[in-house]
Amino acid sequence: MGIVRAHLRIYGRVQGVGFRWSMQREARKLGVNGWVRNLPDGSVEAVLEGEEERVEALIGWAHQGPPFARVTRVEVKWEEPKGEKGFRIVG
């Protein structure tokens, strides 16, 4: 199983609902590296790196998000892995 990198944009009610903190917790549980941040337009951006199956699981989680989120759309772009270490909230 290879290492993959996914670049996500998550839309809907995804700010002010604990999305970043919850994604960080899920990523650490799954052993996925990367980062997550809020964007000025109200969306959330994230980069996920890890084993394909684990990254796919976190993308699946992102379609639902934490309990108070209302995700309307998730865009995924696949990129070359860059060697992310840990999972952090960057903004």
From Swiss-Prot:
It comes from the Archaea. Belongs to the acylphosphatase family. The active site is at R20, N38. Coiled coil: none annotated. Gene3D superfamilies: 3.30.70.100. It catalyses: an acyl phosphate + H2O = a carboxylate + phosphate + H(+). Pfam families: Acylphosphatase. Its EC number is 3.6.1.7. Residues 5-91 form the Acylphosphatase-like domain. Keywords: Hydrolase. GO terms for molecular function: acylphosphatase activity. This is Acylphosphatase. The gene is acyP.
